[in-house]
Amino acid sequence: MADTTTAAQADQKPTRAFGAGRPQRGAGGAPQRGGPRPQRGGQGETKSWTPVTKLGRLVALGLVENIHEIYLFSLPIKEYQIIDKFLNLKDEVMKIVPVQKQTRAGQRTRFKAFVVVGDHNGHVGLGVKCAKEVATAISGAIVAAKLSVIPVRRGYWGNKLGAPHTVPTKVTGKCGSVAVRLVPAPRGTGIVAARVPKKLLQYAGVDDVYTSSRGKTRTMGNFVMATFFAITKTFAYLTPDLWREVKLIKTPYQEHSAKLSEKQQ
């Protein structure tokens, strides 16, 4: 009798509550695997940075504490991690256009991405990248935009009261047939511009400005690049307030030459 009871218990399958043991589903209905996705542009990467340039080594060692030390001596930035260390940038894709090339096998289609980065406080960059896939083009354009980040010089329309809010003087940028002109505006005017240059000026931290454009502005790539070239010219000249004599100082390479030689050994 005992053997019969044991055999019956062995034949019975274990029961479980409905839904028990299944992976929990998120709001979208798919099982949640791992943590949140990393953001675009390398914001979620946890890889350690190993600098390969002299400037990168100085930044990693903490010997260069401010990005304006780099701009002061016009040192070339060839690693985007240097920009990430000093600035908290936001990026936005302006446009993605397909481009084609005629080959023997037929037409080869690739995607061209225009990306703007900036911190809304005097730093802006523009990157252009062409790749076979959209995601590759966007990530490459973000890196190119970070490497092209420039300081934006801001000024006043009238009396020098409060914080700088507009461009210091009239500046013009040109790309292809498109020419964009930036004109200082009174405080409170806002950015009087089309959608493309307005977005770039917002990322640059300019609050009030008049703009005028001419040429084939429908070509958005030339339109945004002409605006970027105009912003670049804000630091292309010296106004009388910058004529004062400045004591010459050593570049970071000269000042920390001993540390660089130790690192190379």
UniProtKB/Swiss-Prot annotation:
Residues 1-49 are annotated as: Disordered. GO terms for molecular function: RNA binding; structural constituent of ribosome. Pfam families: Ribosomal_S5, Ribosomal_S5_C. Residues 89-152 form the S5 DRBM domain. The keyword Ribonucleoprotein applies. Residues 1-25 have a biased composition (Low complexity). Keywords: Acetylation, Ribonucleoprotein, Ribosomal protein. It comes from the Eukaryota. Gene3D superfamilies: 3.30.160.20, 3.30.230.10. GO terms for cellular component: cytosolic small ribosomal subunit; extracellular matrix. The modification N-acetylalanine is found at A2. GO terms for biological process: translation. Component of the ribosome, a large ribonucleoprotein complex responsible for the synthesis of proteins in the cell. The small ribosomal subunit (SSU) binds messenger RNAs (mRNAs) and translates the encoded message by selecting cognate aminoacyl-transfer RNA (tRNA) molecules. The large subunit (LSU) contains the ribosomal catalytic site termed the peptidyl transferase center (PTC), which catalyzes the formation of peptide bonds, thereby polymerizing the amino acids delivered by tRNAs into a polypeptide chain. PANTHER family: 40S RIBOSOMAL PROTEIN S2, RIBOSOMAL S SUBUNIT. Belongs to the universal ribosomal protein uS5 family. This is Small ribosomal subunit protein uS5. The gene is rps2.
